[in-house]
Swiss-Prot record:
It comes from the Bacteria. Keywords: Pyrimidine biosynthesis, Transferase. Pathway: Pyrimidine metabolism; UMP biosynthesis via de novo pathway; (S)-dihydroorotate from bicarbonate: step 2/3. NCBIfam families: asp_carb_tr, PRK00856.1. Gene3D superfamilies: Aspartate/ornithine carbamoyltransferase. HAMAP family: Asp_carb_tr (MF_00001). Its EC number is 2.1.3.2. One of its GO terms (cellular component) is cytosol. The lineage of its organism: Bacteria, Bacillati, Chloroflexota, Chloroflexia, Chloroflexales. It catalyses: carbamoyl phosphate + L-aspartate = N-carbamoyl-L-aspartate + phosphate + H(+). This is Aspartate carbamoyltransferase catalytic subunit. Catalyzes the condensation of carbamoyl phosphate and aspartate to form carbamoyl aspartate and inorganic phosphate, the committed step in the de novo pyrimidine nucleotide biosynthesis pathway. Belongs to the aspartate/ornithine carbamoyltransferase superfamily. ATCase family.
């Protein structure tokens, strides 16, 4: 069994996926179309094709991860690649080996692709300078998480049939969120209008955002901006990246910015509720909303495998 023929109409000429800032609308469209084919593969009785047989993918996760790491592992194995999971703990990194030397070592061992998550913004970019194969950014510091944005785009298009013209509201810890930044690139590139909603302390200077996205709406009034929204994406409070004093209390934050059933009722009837995970239920989203008919949180997780299969496939040049 093989990948459906329509998935192979075009290969990406790019070697790396570091963020969506330099992706054209056409490139994103083609990835989403390929993901449709990969989702069809995952719906078969045997969820595997031989497309990347003989290729070696190393998942380098320097930060803890459940969804992204397992999703990439499943994606690589569904394409018949050899998948190796690397963690800093127990490796030569603990002995002081640099990222560059680690990348060179993995290259010497025959790795064809590196999937990297790192706490330092820019780490995958550094790796890409020294690795002869492909590097995929699986999240770097506050900077970017391009595959999360692609799976979010895919989920919205699968549910609503389009992205162009939609009103997307991103709520929560914008300041520390790599997901917010990559989704800004993705949704605006695909023609959606985006609103950022957060306390001033969790969004930073408006001029920073407007310099890149001049049409962006920025507000701290969730009850107002959520009206007629097609998509509500709420983000986790990233306490591990926060400085002290950014929030008075979690209770105060939840009062003004939690996604509740009452607030969702203000949005469009077909509005989708999204969360990249992991969730702090009762803080940024109420449990009944997370499991409601409008929630696509589990679909996001499931769609991540198909989208990451599409990226691995297109970058491989097979």
């Amino acid at each position: 069994m093989s990948v459906p023929a329509e998935a192979g109409k075009r290969r990406d000429r790019r070697r790396h996926v570091l963020d969506l800032d330099d992706f054209s609308t056409q490139e994103i469209e083609e990835i989403l179309e390929t993901a449709v084919s990969m989702k069809e593969v995952l719906g078969r009785a045997i969820k595997q094709v031989p497309t990347l047989r003989g290729k070696t993918i190393v998942n380098m996760f320097f930060e803890e991860s459940t969804r992204t790491r397992i999703s990439f592992e499943l994606a690589g194995k569904a394409l018949s690649a050899n998948v190796v999971n690397f963690t800093a703990r127990g490796s030569s990194v603990e002995k002081g080996e640099s990222l560059i030397d680690t990348v060179r070592t993995l290259q010497a061992l025959g790795a064809d692709m590196l999937v990297m998550r790192h706490s330092e913004s820019g780490a995958p970019y550094l790796a890409a300078q020294y690795f002869h194969g492909s590097v995929i950014n699986a999240g770097d510091g506050r900077h970017a998480h391009p595959t999360q944005a692609l799976l979010d785009l895919f989920t919205v298009r699968q549910r609503l049939g389009r992205i162009e013209g939609l009103k997307v509201v991103i709520v929560g810890d914008i300041l520390h969120s790599r997901v917010a930044r990559s989704n800004l690139w993705g949704f605006t590139r695909m023609g959606a209008s985006v609103t950022l909603c957060a306390p001033q302390t969790l969004i930073g200077p408006e001029s920073f955002w407007k310099a890149t996205w001049p049409d962006l709406t920025i507000t701290s009034n969730l009850d107002e901006c959520i009206k007629d929204a097609d998509v509500i994406m709420t983000l986790r409070l990233q306490k591990e990246r926060m400085e002290a004093g950014l929030l008075p209390s979690l209770r105060e934050y939840s009062r003004f910015f939690a996604i509740t059933a009452e607030r969702v009722a203000r949005a469009a009837p077909h509005c989708l509720v999204m969360h990249p995970g992991p969730m702090n239920e009762g803080v940024e989203i109420m449990p009944d909303v997370a499991t409601s008919a409008q929630s696509v949180i589990e679909e996001q997780v499931a769609n991540g495998v198909a989208v990451r299969m599409a990226l691995l496939y297109r970058l491989s040049g097979e």
